Amino acid sequence: MESSASPPRSRKAPEERREEILSEAASIALDEGLERITLRAVATRLGVRPGLISHYFPAAEDLVDEAFVRAATIERERFFPDAGSPLERLAHFVHHIETGASLPLARLWLNARHLSRFIPSLEATLQEQDSLDRARLRAIIEDGVASGDFAAVDPEAASIRILIAVDGGGSYVNSTDDLTHPAHVHFVADVAEWTLGLAPGTLGAVATS
C-alpha cells in the first residue's frame, strides 16, 4: 500500500529565504504601497507562517525599510543605464519618466515621503536613497560637461534641480485629472534642457532616434 504522506519540504538556506522575503515585500511596496507590507501579507504571498517572516525581520518597520531599498535599487538601475553617451543616458532617464515607466516608483516615493513623518528609520533610508539617485544623475552630468554635451554647469546643483522637477511631477501621480498637457508631460525634460544649456526638444529627439 502506497503512503499518502506529503514529501518533506526542503529547507531553504537563510540567505535565499531572506532574499525571497525581501523580493516579495518590494513587490507589495510597488503594487500596493509600503503600508501594505505586514509580516502576515508577505507570509501569505509566500505560503508560509508569519512566524517565519518575523524570524528574519522581528519588526515590520525593518522589513518596510529594506523593501523600499530593494524596490528603489531595482528601479534605479532602470533609470540610469551605464551604456551610451551622457546625452543618451540623460535622454533615457527623461524618456523613462515621460512614458510612464516610472509611475510605480513615483507612487512609492510619494508614499514613502508621507510615511517617513511617522517612521524615523524610513526618513533616514529616504535620505540615503535620494543621495544615491543624485550621485548617479550627477555622474551623467559630470560626464556631459567634460564631453561638451552639456554647458559648464555645477553638476551637483544641476542634479538637484532636475530631481526636484522629477519629484514635483511625481506629486501628481495619484491624480485623476487630465495631465496630458505638454507643459506637464515634458516638465522634467524642459527643466533638464534649461539647466544644462540644451536646445528645447533635444532630449526627446535623442530618446526617439
Predicted regions and their residues:
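N-terminal intrinsically disordered/low-complexity leader segments
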Residues: M1-E16, G201-S209
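Helix-turn-helix
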Residues: E20, E24-D62, E66
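Solvent-exposed, amphipathic alpha-helical segments
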Residues: E20, E24-E32, E77-R78, L108, ...
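Residues in soluble alpha-helical coiled-coils and helical-bundle/repeat scaffolds
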Residues: P58-D62, F80, G84, R117, ...
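Hydrophobic alpha-helical connector segments
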Residues: E66, E77-R107, A158-I162, V185, ...
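Short, basic, alpha-helical segments at the C-terminal edge of helix-turn-helix-like DNA-binding modules
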Residues: V69-E75
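Amphipathic alpha-helical segments used for helix-helix packing
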Residues: A101-A124, N174
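Hydrophobic/aromatic-rich alpha-helical bundle segments in the mid-to-C-terminal region
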Residues: E123-Q127, S131, V145-S209
